[in-house]
Amino acid sequence: MRRGDFTAALLAYEVLLAQGHSQAAQIALNIGLCRKRLVDPEGLSSAPPVRPMPAAAPTSVSKSLPLSTLTAAARSAVALEGKLTVSLTTIDSRLPHLHRVIESLHQQDVSPKEIRLHISREPYLLDKGISPDDPHLKELQQFPLIKVKWVDNTGPYRKIVPFLQEHFSHHVATDELFVTVDDDTLYPPEFLRVLLETYERHDCVVAFRGRAMVLEAAEIASYPAWGIGLDYPSMSNLPTGKDGVLYSTRFFTRDFVRLDDAIALAPTADDLWIKWQCGLNGVPAIVLNPIACTSDYKGFPVVDYSKEYRGNSLYSSYNANSAQGKNDDSVRKLEAYVKGLLGQSLAQVIQMAQPA
């Protein structure tokens, strides 16, 4: 087997283990074997494990077989090939593990056009800044689809705003699809394909994870009253980014990239700012795995479940403690902001979209 085969198997086993599969012991053994073969393909070395080098980009099935001979699923994959960009950001402390995330994105059924990594030299929030000479960064740049972008440090907004700024800078703007991902999550091979296929059916924001906002007295209710996401397009759905979200650039306006207000209202809650922008543009969202928001173990696996690693995140450091109060405060500020700016709140949009 090739290194890429072991990598794909490793990701599949990790997903099964995270989902609590009944054969957990055997799966854990298989994970160990895959990791050993990634490090030592011949299985002969007794040396301590070292980090595997990036796998080569998968060869598109369309280059090896005539379209007429492919299955329906394979024809769909060919048609979707290269139709979107993947966008993410990271901080200095996450770089040592990021190669695993990037490798999972290189093992997709449907390859993206490119994977944009937006990083910054200057510190902000948890990020101490990244040096261009960082050896982990140099390793990441060996991946064929990676494109490193040095940008101003706006925290979590870096995964979406630089891409939209570039898009809106064109004199003739075209519709572009892009997927935002997190820097600590391993994405299964069907990840991008499922997002794209769902988008083509429903023409809306598509997420694997999210919450459904609830109205009380014509206002957005307090966070504890919110439900799990709805698995159909709804204005009530608020996608949350960990397991990936697909957007079209036409879901946004140029106002979105003016970040002073966003950072003032929701400096670490980019999911809220994005929802308010898309919602007020009349764009619903669908959540494909509603229970993912109830536990990290119900969604895609992360690179490290240790308390030390998971604790070093914006959510844990800024949003987790008294998260309800912080979320509710951000919602109130956003509602007042958009009502003053546009004369309409998101609650009104949600209410109008509900069946009579």
Task: Walk through the language-model features, giving the residues of each.
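Active-site-proximal specificity loops/subdomain of glycosyltransferases
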Residues: 120-175
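Alpha-helical linker/edge segments of TPR/alpha-solenoid repeat scaffolds
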Residues: 32-51
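C-terminal catalytic/acceptor-binding lobe
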Residues: 64-65, 77-82, 97, 101, ...
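Conserved catalytic core of nucleotide-sugar-dependent glycosyltransferases
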Residues: 186-261
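Short beta-strand-to-loop acidic/aromatic patch adjacent to the donor-nucleotide binding site
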Residues: 172-184
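N-proximal low-complexity "stem/linker" segments adjacent to membrane-targeting elements
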Residues: 48-107
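Short, acidic, metal-binding catalytic loop of nucleotide-sugar glycosyltransferases
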Residues: 101-113, 121-124, 139
